[in-house]
């Protein structure tokens, strides 16, 4: 099983962190937590409202608090928001308290998956492709830097990606326990 206290899913919006994460958590009998949902619960309002009235810095502060609290537990699968990686403290905590899986996706697949999504504050722009490309350029190196495992989810259904990730995680953890 996972040698780290938690399993942490990172990656851009639309990569499948929540949908795949729920399935993985169920398979490995982990408690599932989504940082965006936890932020909404803590703030008592939507992420869009937080961005609109309090700004992105306040959202990132709440995100840091929520992630810190979630990582203080064990046996959790934590699906993070796409921008969680931007904070150096978050990156450090995720590496220290989790096995980090980067769900990688290209911008064109993101556009397809997010075509009907009108709720993400960072996508409330006319040129979504440019926004996603800019976010990709900024965040991709950070995702790769802290990832213990990278899985590309382009052209995979959530079920296929889940099955592949279960195989990859099981093989990795068995290998880790055999060398320990």
Swiss-Prot record:
The keyword Glycosyltransferase does not apply. The keyword Transferase applies. The gene is aroK. Pathway: Metabolic intermediate biosynthesis; chorismate biosynthesis; chorismate from D-erythrose 4-phosphate and phosphoenolpyruvate: step 5/7. Mg(2+) binds at residue 18. Substrate binds at residues 36, 60, 82, 139. Binds 1 Mg(2+) ion per subunit. It comes from the Bacteria. Gene3D superfamilies: P-loop containing nucleotide triphosphate hydrolases (3.40.50.300). Its cofactor is Mg(2+). Transmembrane segments: none annotated. It catalyses: shikimate + ATP = 3-phosphoshikimate + ADP + H(+). PANTHER family: SHIKIMATE KINASE, SHIKIMATE KINASE 1, CHLOROPLASTIC. GO terms for biological process: amino acid biosynthetic process; aromatic amino acid family biosynthetic process; chorismate biosynthetic process. This is Shikimate kinase. Belongs to the shikimate kinase family. Catalyzes the specific phosphorylation of the 3-hydroxyl group of shikimic acid using ATP as a cosubstrate.
């Amino acid at each position: 099983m996972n040698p780290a206290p938690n399993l942490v899913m990172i990656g851009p919006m639309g990569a499948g962190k929540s949908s795949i994460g729920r399935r993985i958590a169920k398979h490995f009998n982990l408690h599932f937590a989504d940082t965006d949902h936890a932020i909404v619960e803590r703030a008592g309002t939507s992420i869009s409202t937080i961005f609109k009235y309090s700004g992105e810095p306040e959202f990132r502060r709440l995100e840091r608090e929520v992630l810190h609290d979630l990582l203080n537990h064990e046996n959790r699968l934590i699906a993070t928001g796409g921008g969680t990686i931007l904070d150096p403290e978050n990156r450090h905590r995720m590496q220290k308290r989790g096995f980090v899986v980067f769900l990688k996706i290209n911008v064109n697949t993101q556009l397809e998956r997010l075509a009907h999504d009108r709720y993400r504050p960072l996508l409330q722009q006319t040129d979504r492709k440019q926004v996603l490309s800019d976010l990709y350029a900024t965040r991709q190196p950070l995702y790769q830097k802290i990832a213990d495992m990278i899985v590309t989810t382009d052209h995979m259904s959530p079920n296929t990606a889940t099955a592949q990730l279960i195989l990859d995680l099981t093989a990795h953890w068995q290998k880790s326990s055999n060398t320990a």
